[in-house]
Amino acid sequence: WSERYAAQAEILRYIGHVADRFDLRSLIRFETRVVSATYDDDAGVWTVRTNRGDSFRARFCIMATGCLSVPNTPDIPGLADFGGTVLHTAQWPHQPVDFTGKRVGVVGTGSSGIQAIPVIAETARQLTVFQRTPNFSLPSRNRPLTEQDHAQFEAGFEAYLESLQHSDFGRVPPGAATAPVPPRDVQWQRYEALWQEGGGAILYAFPNILTHHGVNDVACDFVRGKIREAVHDPLTADDLCPTNHPLGVKRICVDSGYFETFNRPDVTLINLRREPIERFTPTGVQTSERMIELDMLVFATSFDAITGALLAMDISGRDGRTLKEAWADGP
């Protein structure tokens, strides 16, 4: 890769390279959606039908639909009435989006929102961020990768692959973790070093950071302290500090200048716990306290996770029982 966190265009080129190298395109039916999968008890096979009218029969039907593939858009009254541009971070246009001089609203401060907000703020006339739940985010420290970086990686490639087989999340911890519970000042020093390193390294600071409340509490205090250092307005800083979940139990986000973005005079944070959205209007958003005029609206509201793609299809198993029936009370 050309940088520590490769951008979309570079990742897309790599995917295209893999598809061409292994002649995968000939095995893929593009612009085709599966609408149903029905199991035949007598024959012991599945019949899969698509929106193009095709049908396929197979002994095995593997649903590789992914956990995060169906975008989630909140059901808020009036969205269809909004006269501006509506985007979702999970369905981004192939063409560049120009926010120059626009009044933009971003709904959501999860992974994609945290990545998009600093970039949008660079050119938007006014950016309003609507946040329900703040999230922990760590600095990415993104940078171009040098020839030395590549040489070091290639020299230890076999050992690196072996270590990945025994790691969680498919990554190698950035150094030996200390056990069991060091003093608070020792924890703080290690967190500071890993904060400067960037990425999700803090999650690997100590082996019990995800299982020991005391260790995790110190980590949370450290990150919240960094947020308050970065954000000048105390109320905004408090609103951006997560307090209802430990560090690491939700997916850790990484960012480039996310918290600092809220120091800009043209960026406003709306805490939806205090000031919920009541409805969208043709010209913007009506909250419980004010009307906010917008030209563009960006939903960074994640996905219908885990089951969304599966329940979107009509899947019937043994005895004609549908997946929706089987999972009526949860999967």
Name the predicted role of every residue range.
Residues 1-80, 84, 95-96, 109, ...:
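N-terminal FAD-binding dinucleotide-binding subdomain shared by FAD-dependent oxidases/monooxygenases
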Residues 89-101:
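A short, basic/flexible loop-to-alpha-helix module at the beginning of a structural domain
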Residues 100-110:
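Beta1/beta-strand and adjacent pyrophosphate-binding region of the FAD-binding site
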Residues 116-120:
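Aromatic pocket-lining residues of Rossmann-like dinucleotide-binding sites
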